[in-house]
């Protein structure tokens, strides 16, 4: 299997294409185009009758897509979140869908996007810079409790309250407008430790997830993807942290496995699976990590939508599964051992 251009190295490239099982005349959707590494691989396997739809809410990614694939009649380009993919494709019409979650390497590498604590730039963090509130805008008006809740819920930051109090105190003296300002402030209030991870890592992740509604979009996108897939179609999702992966894993399991039965409850309708798990968690091997260290935290999961005949053969007793809920800052979490987290 050919490799993508060296200029951009998409994570788990070969595993994604194998998981999607791209066919010559199939219809595929890349819900997170980025710089098009996976999309190029799909196109290499499509014939003249194949079709590729690409989506991204980042205007820079859309510009790359139009420049790279604008002349290819097989490609349709749409700006927007994959949460709205149901508005782009009709139900049961797609053979494969890829969602490559989180922030892209180009977004991290450009200081002006405000995602990285390692590169000083405006404190923005929006994947769509034309929509919503920037990180600086939110931090300027959120209460210390709201900030602490976000840091704990989306970053699992044990020092969430301490950091939130420091942010509120500092903004009273001067506005927080730069990534370096925020990173230095967080580092100044964190306990000294031996961790090689930058002290602002969890906080930056949490604020970014909140600003972009990433987990809400993920749940909406998974539901939309299930409806858009044909029977036999494949859903491939790459996640980069435990919150994302938990949602993906639970979503796939909810539609693939009957929930545990309870002898004390009356017998329910038979459970009818909608998905079949193609793989467990797939991670990058050492050879990929040597070329692309950012793949270290990537986890790929693949599931296949079942046709009615396969669904009936997989029927089992069950009581149905309650709809999963992504974590929100309003959720109540246990207090951390140091008593600092909300």
From Swiss-Prot:
Its EC number is 2.1.1.199. One of its GO terms (biological process) is rRNA base methylation. Residues 333-342 have a biased composition (Polar residues). Keywords: Cytoplasm, Methyltransferase, rRNA processing, S-adenosyl-L-methionine, Transferase. It is found in: Cytoplasm. GO terms for molecular function: rRNA (cytosine-N4-)-methyltransferase activity. It catalyses: cytidine(1402) in 16S rRNA + S-adenosyl-L-methionine = N(4)-methylcytidine(1402) in 16S rRNA + S-adenosyl-L-homocysteine + H(+). S-adenosyl-L-methionine binds at residues 36-38, 56, 82, 100, 107. InterPro entries: RsmH, SAM-dep_MeTrfase_MraW_recog, SAM-dependent_MTases_sf. Residues 309-342 are annotated as: Disordered. The keyword Methyltransferase applies. GO terms for cellular component: cytoplasm. It comes from the Bacteria. SUPFAM superfamilies: Putative methyltransferase TM0872, insert domain (SSF81799), S-adenosyl-L-methionine-dependent methyltransferases (SSF53335). HAMAP family: 16SrRNA_methyltr_H (MF_01007). Specifically methylates the N4 position of cytidine in position 1402 (C1402) of 16S rRNA. Belongs to the methyltransferase superfamily. RsmH family. This is Ribosomal RNA small subunit methyltransferase H. The lineage of its organism: Bacteria, Pseudomonadati, Pseudomonadota, Gammaproteobacteria, Lysobacterales. The gene is rsmH.
């Amino acid at each position: 299997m050919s490799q993508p251009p060296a200029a951009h190295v998409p994570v788990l490239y070969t595993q994604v294409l194998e998981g999607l099982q791209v066919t010559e005349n199939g219809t595929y959707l890349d819900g997170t185009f980025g710089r098009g590494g996976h999309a190029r691989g799909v196109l290499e396997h499509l014939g003249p009758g194949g079709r590729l739809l690409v989506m991204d809410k980042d205007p820079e990614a859309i510009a790359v897509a139009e420049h790279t694939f604008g002349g290819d009649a097989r490609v349709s380009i749409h700006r927007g979140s994959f949460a709205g993919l149901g508005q782009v494709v009709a139900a049961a019409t797609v053979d494969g869908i890829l969602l490559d979650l989180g922030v892209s390497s180009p977004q991290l590498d450009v200081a002006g996007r405000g995602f990285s604590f390692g590169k000083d730039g405006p404190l923005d963090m929006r994947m769509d810079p034309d929509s919503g509130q920037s990180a600086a805008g939110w931090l300027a008006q959120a209460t210390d409790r709201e900030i602490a809740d976000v840091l704990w819920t989306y970053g699992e930051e044990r020092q969430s309250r301490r950091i939130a109090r420091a942010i509120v105190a500092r903004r009273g003296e001067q506005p927080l407008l730069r990534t370096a300002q925020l990173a230095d402030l967080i580092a100044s209030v964190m306990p000294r430790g031996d961790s090689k991870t930058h002290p602002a890592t969890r906080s930056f992740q949490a604020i970014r997830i909140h600003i972009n509604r990433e987990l809400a979009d993920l749940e909406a996108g998974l539901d939309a993807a299930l409806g858009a897939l044909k029977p036999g179609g494949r859903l491939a999702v790459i996640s980069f942290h435990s919150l994302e992966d938990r949602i993906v894993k639970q979503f796939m399991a909810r539609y693939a496995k009957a929930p545990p039965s309870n002898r004390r409850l009356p017998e329910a309708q038979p459970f009818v699976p909608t998905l079949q798990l193609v793989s467990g968690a797939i991670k990058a091997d050492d050879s990929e990590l040597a070329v692309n260290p950012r793949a270290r935290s990537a986890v790929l999961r693949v599931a296949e939508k079942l046709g009615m005949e396969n669904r009936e053969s997989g029927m089992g007793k069950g009581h149905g599964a309650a709809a999963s809920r992504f974590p929100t800052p309003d959720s109540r979490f246990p207090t951390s051992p140091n008593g600092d987290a909300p």
